[in-house]
């Protein structure tokens, strides 16, 4: 028991360090490309000329594609293990291919830092899980390998989103049946250790998103939250179907990986000429939506362009995560509804923010089929725990409808 406790804490601390180092590497590339270190790719896009804005994501995609293509071409052996930590935990034995995972993470760093509309958390969690896998193979029994990889993945998620409980449930819900409930203890300990470490490294204990404090929802607001869950239940499968169609369209072009990723990048770059907000994973835009939301038409325009950018990035094969882009789409959809509802003052002054947070949780639930994780993650990311009952209700509704329409979640379809 003591041994597991010590290993869990160690994996949590190292995972947080890995996530922090990846973020520092992103800031370093941002300084090289844009002479900025504020971490906002949207601000970087707005500060450069139009031709640079159009070409930078394409060049980043080209560089990442060349890296992946060269590795595949000159690697004379088949991968000894997967590079997907989900696969390693669910159907594998806990091993990850070290060299392939490192190359994939480096390629992700290139596309994320150059503006592609893809999440950075994919590489962060992969690297955390990779360290846990290497450690387990050397110091643990084979029957424990999956457990420690799960600890690394949960700790990476907790570090990236400041959400240790949601990071733990991310493993428990999405990989249901592959881990015994008794094994959840080390996963939670690793995730909490990761949060404490990342707070120490970043010099603060702020939530990921800063929002105004909301009171407990009124009965009519609970109804609207449930209604938004219903809408997300239909929107989630459509979003996943669009991602699958985009991927199929890019593959049908039969391009080499460098050209395929460059094409995805140029689409993002051209869209950014209309709205610079399409650059990056969407974190800064979500923060802006939650604090100073623009008008309905502007939100709608940004949403359409960002959605096309996400489809271009993911469809072209850009390595990265879809968590944060999904949160953005959900926040924008929710804020659109909230802005419309705000025309009726009886629904409350904070209805826009409430709907945006509900949209984030429900679309995440509809795409991951993990309602408890999605609801708890939004609460942890914002500190708005008074919303948890309403978010749980709306997320369960969204997940139920999404499962009925499309039994395969975003993680089963990738």
UniProtKB/Swiss-Prot annotation:
Main localization category: membrane
Localization of this protein: Cell inner membrane
Superkingdom classification of source: Bacteria
Transmembrane portions of the chain: 5-25, 54-74, 116-136, 147-167, 169-189, 220-240, 255-275, 292-312, 327-347, 353-373, 381-401
Record flagged with keyword Ribosomal protein: no
Membrane topology according to the record: Multi-pass membrane protein
Annotated S-S bridges: none
A GO term, aspect molecular function: voltage-gated chloride channel activity
Pfam families reported in the protein's UniProt record: Voltage_CLC
Keywords linked to the UniProt accession: Cell inner membrane, Cell membrane, Chloride, Chloride channel, Ion channel, Ion transport, Membrane, Transmembrane, Transmembrane helix, Transport, Voltage-gated channel
GO biological process, one term: response to acidic pH
GO cellular component: chloride channel complex; plasma membrane
Keyword Transport set for record: yes
Family according to the record: Belongs to the chloride channel (TC 2.A.49) family. ClcB subfamily.
Function comment: Probably acts as an electrical shunt for an outwardly-directed proton pump that is linked to amino acid decarboxylation, as part of the extreme acid resistance (XAR) response.
Protein name: Voltage-gated ClC-type chloride channel ClcB
